[in-house]
Amino acid sequence: MNDTTGTLGHAIFTGLEKNEYLNEIYDALLHNDFLRLFRIDDIAQKEVDTEDALRFADLLSKSVNTEQSERHRSLAQEIITLLNALNPDDEEIQYVMGAVLSSTSNYLGLQHSVPDFQENNVLDRLSDEINRDYLRIPSQQDGYFLRSQKAVYDHMTEDDYFSYSGPTSMGKSFVMRTFIRERISPDCNFAILVPTKALINEVSKEIADNLGELLRQHDYRIITSAGAMILQEKNEHRYVFVMTPERMMYQLIGFKDIPIHYLFI
C-alpha cells in the first residue's frame, strides 16, 4: 500500500469530517430539511451560511489520500443534495452540485439532477470526459459505474476468483447483473447462491426484470429448484441458477453434465 501520510491531500483532508463547524452546518441542514419534509412551520429553522456549506461540499468532494476519502465524498453529496432541496432555484447551488457530482464521479446523479452541467475550465472538461469514458458501462452509452463499482467489475472480468465485501448501497447486485449481461452467450451458465430461500424469489425477479428480454433472446432459463422439469432437457438451453447452497449441491449431484461457468456467492 502506498504511504500517503506526507502528501498535501493527507494534510488537508485528514480529520476533516470531525470539523466542528462542518458538523454544525450538516446538523442544521438535516434539521431544516426535516422541517421541510414534514411541513412543520412552528419550529424555527437553523441558520446556515450557504457559501460556507458550498465550500465544504466542494472541498469534501475532492478528498484524496486519507482513509476517510469515501466518507468525505459521500458527505459532500449529502450536503449539496440538502442545500438543493432547501433552495431548489438557486443557480449557484445547482452549479456546485454539478461540480460535486462530477468530482465524485456520480454521473448517474449528474444526469438526473444537473444534466446540462459543464465544467468551466477546459482541462477540467477534458478530465471529466476521460473519466466518463473510463466509468462508462459496457454496451450503455449513457450509463456509468460508480468508481467503487468499476473497481469490482474490473476484478471480476480479469480475475479467475474474486472476493469482495462492501455496503449494500454500493450496488453489488447491479455489478453482478452487468457482468452476466456482458457474458450471455451459447456457452455460459451462471449460478447465484443466496443464503436463504426467501431471497431466491427476490434475486430471480431482479434478474428477470433487468435481463429477461436478453435471456429469452439467447434461450436462457432461470432455475430456482434442482428438480425443475426443464433440466431434464439437459444442455438444450442455457441457465441462470438462483439457489441456496443446499439446492445447488443437489443440482450438481443430479445434473453433473450441466456445467457452471460463473458462480456468484
Residue ranges and their predicted role:
Residues M1-I265:
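N-terminal helicase ATP-binding lobe
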